[in-house]
A protein has these predicted regions:
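Conserved acidic segment of CheY-like receiver
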Residues: 2-14, 18-22, 52, 149
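Short hydrophobic/Thr-rich beta-strand motif most characteristic of the beta2 strand and flanking loop
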Residues: 27-35, 43
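Acidic catalytic/metal-coordinating carboxylates
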Residues: 36, 62-65
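Active-site beta3 strand of CheY-like receiver
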Residues: 47-54, 58
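Short amphipathic alpha-helix used as the core "switch/output" element in two-component signaling
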Residues: 64-75
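Short, flexible helix-to-coil linker/hinge segments that flank and couple to helix-turn-helix
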Residues: 91-95, 100-147, 151, 155
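Recognition helix of helix-turn-helix DNA-binding domains
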Residues: 163-183
């Protein structure tokens, strides 16, 4: 049985190339190509695809919006986000909504087909570069969250805040209006 697919990308040549690749494998029926999120929703309703390959940064209704709608309505559709660049925030949002795959447009053909096969076998596929970027971002934010002050550091911070005069836009360093602060 062939897998039904919808391709969503505002770059027609790219979308047609993906269509040709999928058809050449003999395992897919491309039910349609959409150039916008709104058009994608119409194709989903009409064709009930098993897989959507979607550019994560399409127009007015974004790839994330499409993903949310599909997940909220519990549609049994696999979703592969494809992007020309790594956007950590979009990747994290997509992962939070259980995207099935994230891949870059400059990936090799074998990586692209591996991503699709992994997804169709109920595995998640995340391109290694995207995974590294997300992990680096999360490690940085985790370090910020874990920072705690000692009792003494807290006391010093409170003293500093208490003794700091309010900022006025007319008072700049060197204007002769600075005050000495005694600790």
């Amino acid at each position: 049985m062939k897998n039904s697919v919808i391709i969503v990308d505002d770059q027609t040549l790219f979308a047609e190339g993906i269509k040709s690749i999928l058809i050449s494998t003999g395992n897919f029926i491309v039910k349609g190509i959409a150039s916008s999120g709104l058009e994608c929703l119409g194709l989903i309703d009409k064709n009930k695809p098993g897989l959507i390959i979607i550019n994560s940064s399409i127009g007015e209704i974004s790839g994330i919006d499409i993903l949310k709608i599909i997940r909220e309505h519990k549609m049994p559709i696999k979703i592969l986000f494809i992007s020309s660049e790594i956007n950590v925030n979009v990747s994290i949002d997509a992962l939070n909504y259980n995207v099935d795959g994230l891949i870059l447009k400059n990936s090799s053909l074998s990586d692209f087909l591996s991503a699709i096969n992994s997804i169709l076998e109920d595995n998640q596929f995340i391109h290694p570069f995207i995974l590294d970027a997300v992990n680096s971002y999360l490690a940085q934010t985790d370090n910020c969250k874990k920072t705690t002050l000692t009792k003494r550091e807290t006391q010093i911070l409170k003293i500093g805040l208490h003794n700091t005069p309010p900022f006025h836009s007319d008072q700049y360093p060197g204007s002769g209006q600075e005050e000495e602060i005694a600790f």
